[in-house]
Amino acid sequence: MVDLQLHQSLGHHNFTNKLTFYVNGVKRTISNPDPRGTLLDFIRTHEGLTGTKLGCSEGGCGACTVVVASWDREQGEIIYSAVNSCIVPLVAVEGKHLITVEGIGSSNNPHPAQERIALFHGSQCGFCTPGIVMSLYALLRNTGGQPSKEQIAESFDGNLCRCTGYKPIIDAANTFSCGRPGGCCRDNASGKANGAGATVGNGMANGAAAVANGNGAAANGCCKGNGAANGCCKSNGSAATTANGDDKEVDMNKLFTPNGLPLKPYSAKTELIFPPALKKYELNPLFFGNEQKVWFRPVTKLQLLQIKHAYPESKIVGGASEIQIEIKMKAANYNISVYANDIEELKTHKYIPGKGLEFGANISLSKLEEVCDKLVHELDPNVSQIYGAILEQLKYFAGRQIRNAATPAGNIATASPISDLNPVLVAAEAVLTVESIENGEEQISMTDFFVGYRKTKLPAHGVITKIFVPETVPRNEVVMAYKQAKRKDDDIAIVTACLRLALDDDFRISKARLAYGGVGPFTTAAKGTAEFLTGKLLRRETAKEVLEGAIDCLIKEFDLPYSVPGGMAAYRRTLIMSFFYKFYSTVLEKIGLAGEAQDNSALENTYDPQALLEVTRKHPVGSRDLTNPYEQRIVGKSDPHLSALKQVTGEAVYIDDIPPYHGECFGVQVMSTKPRARILSVDPSPALEVEGVVGYVDVNDLPSREANIWGPTPVGKEPFFADGEVYYVGQCIGVIIATDRMIAEEAARLVKVEYEELETVITIEEAIEAQSFFDYQPKAEKGDVDGAFAESAYTFEGTSRIGSQEHFYLETQGSLVVPEPEDGEMKVYSSSQNPTETQVFVAQATGVPSSRIVARVKRLGGGFGGKESRCCHLSSIAAVAAKKYKRPVRMILSRSEDMLTAGQRHPFVMKWKVGLDKNYKFTALEAKLYANAGWSMDLTKGVIERAVLHAENCYDFPNARIQGIPCRTSVASNTAFRGFGGPQGMFMAECYIYEIADQLGIEPDTLREINYLVPGVSSTPFKQAITEDFTVPDMVKQIKKQSNYDDLRRQVEEFNSKHKWIKRGLAHVPTMFGISFGATFLNQAGALVHIYHDGSILLTHGGTEMGQGLHTKMAMVCAEELKVPLSQVFISETSTNTVPNTSASAASASSDLNGMAVKHACDQLNERLAPYRERLGENATMEQLAHAAYFDRVNLSANGFYKTPDIGFVWGDPNPKPAFFYFTQGCAVAMVEVNTLTGDWSNLRTDIVMDIGRPINQAIDYGQIEGAFVQGQGLFTIEESLWLRNGALFTRGPGAYKIPGFRDIPQEFNVGHLRDRPFKHLKTIHRSKGIGEPPLFLGSSVFFAIRDALSYARRQNLGEATMPAGLVAPMTTERIRMLAGDSLYEHKGKIEPTEGDDKPFFVNA
């Protein structure tokens, strides 16, 4: 409890509890607001502005981004700061102007940023979009609407999108770039055209001509260097080049999208004005709260010191980036918080010539970045080195939103062992000024500030007020900063360092400071190594000895055990050495001891100039092939997503945006903390005593024990509530129901559960050893496998491993259940891909027929398979609570809860054996595919079946035996994920292609070409005949020509021959994905079409909209068939009371199934309207036709239905029907660049060609291709799920789990489709093809390109002609570094387990 009586020492300061600020131009004065909430809570709950979304609660995804505008009195200007409202406290906007996405535009009058993202197809599910819009808005306001491309790129580094692949968002933003669609000429953009029929950079147009957004150097040079013939792009719109190659002046008032839609010009004059009253507003000290928590907001340093003196236990808050995470994730309780970011005295900065930089402890990191950048450009480079090091670290420090709010003092005082900034301050010998009422002002050196894990020398009453960073001396001093993470931008460090050496005029080392983070419990200086270096003379003849000695010292100082907390022991040790090796070469270069490297052994080289190089990172460019010979009146056009403008303006409604119902409660699960245990007792009584708690539900509140068992398949059963035992960390034991979310969360933690722990199995290897398998083990078999192996000229065996992948849909699982007063009826609003199963299981859990449950789905904020079955559980337990308490119940999972409980993509271990004849043609395949199913089967049956059915990819095996074996483990049930087992099976196929080609000494493409399936001849291992639908070889030819593949290979060879540490790799990968549900009965769909008097049309179908554009495509089909404009067709939602018994929106079949059902309904209506069309003429409007038909009593409503013909595969049938209606195929070429010294890498270029048939909407299909590819790239490279040894998932949020960001996409991204095909064989809706899942596997091309790059490194370093067998996906930076084969790792970096220390810290399930 907090004493609300203000401490007597503070009484004279006139504290107030009233907060005054503006929201979207409207003044707000709030008295004593709820102290528990964040700014986001206020925006959504108090203001009802639900456009700003909650995505993660830790400032890692950017969905909650808003803009805070403030008046900078010192500069006399308005600063627009994008911030994460999910972590920033409400007090942070006092005296400022808060701008949300609703404040800048509406769907009827969108802001140019909103409109361009919408019309460039930059919004799919839309949940992330408002945050992205606001990041761009802040940039436009701060740059006057003319940002550079580099500014655009860095402005998005705190935003994530899981759908689009980012490219269309970047292209939309590029239209603002200094008046030039290709970007500002100072960004070195060129006007390179991409040929007829293609637009580069998603295309911009001036009139009808598409303007290219090229790559490389500007044709006319930068206007700043007087190279541009037409003057500065900022003044007149720079010369750009059209697709026809003609220079053309770009009029920024006449911009168009690729398909000719005009764009609204940007004018700063029409922007929301900054409230004039705020320029004069005087901040007053604040004190508000309740008995649980209070906030102070001092406005002077003295007030802050006095508060800290009166309340030494108080927590000082700057950006709240660390504190809010501790509150949310660790249930930390900071009863007294002090917001210190409005104290101007703590935000000053001054450079003292000849001495250094002094800055206030609470200057924002963005401002510090700006200050250091200015010093780096203005001072002698030797003097400004330390500021360059700070700048280098800040560049990749979190995201822009965090840097706008976070402060140096917060970063220092938090004492994180992986801080990016602290090693620089330690190496710089920075001095902290610490003040307190007791001791006044004192100085503490950063060199000995940290004394333990999260412990410092900061006194209990002390406040850091200033930081002084000395400048480096003008001569013979070198400072460099380094950081390595899993993802380059917005990621926590694995190892970070700042290394500093000073030498005298004889090049004798006079001082050394080597500060490392990520290698111990706190930021540590390598004092022993510094002592070794001090006094050493650097000469050519001594340099090698000094290098070797220093590295040996570093290894001894940072002796990381195999089981070190945080894992990656060998990688971290190798990074320690790699950073020093890079630094040492920098030192030798700067003091003039540069000499050519003598050979390829790291420790043999005294000076290695190539160690200084970094991987190439450029602003993304690329092309989309926009030719479409099959475009019809509506179908085939690239219309934007129907909800795009609603999504970019925040008007689109998701589950948690539905206004609260009267009496609504919030539910939070009580989850198991053990992976496998008996429940001895559950005591909710402490929770029930909390004010605001309504009650508790568990298995005893179901109609029967039998009703507790549910599951999407007959073999995939599990309980709603744990009943006697728990099987994984996170399993639902019960649900606390309370009047609001925060109360429910607090109370759920108070429920007491006692366990008796049982034996656990976490990994596939452990399951194999324990024979822990589920009974269902599908097998596909064809031919005489054993006989074929006996006659094979070659036989190869191997094992392929691929890890799991988190869905990371931006909208977490959510449900709102509203009980009706009669007959047990309920309305269920769910973020579900599967409304029918939601209906079925809610009915089961509440004991009523399905007819009394209406499941409704407006849209999902992403699904990717993760909301196919797992959503049903959440809706059902919410329904149990709603029934018991007769009140609406809302349950929205936090990001941590969602990742802990909702399951992931299945990890696989796949053991294969392949036979070949003397001509290298495959003779036989035998494989066993082990999948980690988790604790229950869920949808594993279908996943492992599809993995088996895709284990040959597109290669011909006359004899095959492939078996799937699901492993029972003690982790959450793994579930459907885009590709549904297909990518794992095809990954195995490409692994054996590469490994066998290595062993045979031939190119993988040679092996592929020999073994492609042959139409009319071949059949798959599941005996489906290959028809003319097989197009992979044709696409391979097309993509190799399009990408200039042979020339790229020559470039790679040449580059690698000249570069030692940076290597390039090139790979080509095909894919062949079967389209149909594995369960034949699911291949059906229904639709309902109503035509009203006014000619408007209401369409409902069985599919759900999750960003894939299904509603848009279905509306286009309906409009095409009924011969009306697209604007006349409206889709409101998907609901079980309009179209019953639907299949989940999954398997890439939703357009096929629902499209045909829509067509069937429209055919009926057209037949009924035919007489009226004949009578009234072809030009009659639908309104006229509907009127005439109505008065003749003609039914203007039709129900359509469709079931996929000619399929019906049955496992074990010796002569089965086809498993798939057709295959969607494609191929990709990827070229990467890898830094083998650190593991860092970048995707230089990707080209994709897909067989998409005759697309219903080409732009939507391209969005699916790009988005799936980037998601697949994540699967095969940076996305790594890790478990602790106690069975708990460690990677439970964007801080620990990394998906690709804006700067991880290909730097040149070219997408096209199979050309010159009539597609007459297709029997699909308008001869289109399903596209949602098939492109995802193409992301593996990046994995194999990295493999290719590493093969060059190993050939150079070890003389090995082949790569090690059994490479593991994802190919993380750690795995890349460990595979390089250089002497630093091979001789010094390896860490072997010792007796009693044989288990790594993390587990890969």
From Swiss-Prot:
PROSITE patterns: 2FE2S_FER_1, 2FE2S_FER_2, FAD_PCMH. It is an enzyme of class 1 (oxidoreductase). Substrate binds at residues 868, 946, 980. Its EC number is 1.17.1.4. SMART domains: Ald_Xan_dh_C, CO_deh_flav_C. It is found in: Cytoplasm. [2Fe-2S] cluster 1 binds at residues 56, 61, 64, 86. It catalyses: hypoxanthine + NAD(+) + H2O = xanthine + NADH + H(+); xanthine + NAD(+) + H2O = urate + NADH + H(+). Disruption phenotype: Exhibits less than 1% of the wild-type activity towards xanthine and hypoxanthine under inducible conditions (2.5 mmol/l adenine). No activity after cultivation without inducer. GO terms for biological process: cellular response to ammonium ion; cellular response to cadmium ion; cellular response to copper ion; cellular response to iron ion; cellular response to nitrate; cellular response to zinc ion; guanine catabolic process; hypoxanthine catabolic process. Optimum pH is 8.5 in glycine-NaOH. Optimum pH is between 7.5 and 9.5 in potassium phosphate, Tris-HCl and Tris-acetate. Binds 1 Mo-molybdopterin (Mo-MPT) cofactor per subunit. Belongs to the xanthine dehydrogenase family. Key enzyme in purine degradation. Catalyzes the oxidation of hypoxanthine to xanthine. Catalyzes the oxidation of xanthine to uric acid. Oxidizes xanthine, hypoxanthine and pterine at high rates. Can also act on purine and guanine. This is Xanthine dehydrogenase. It comes from Blastobotrys adeninivorans.
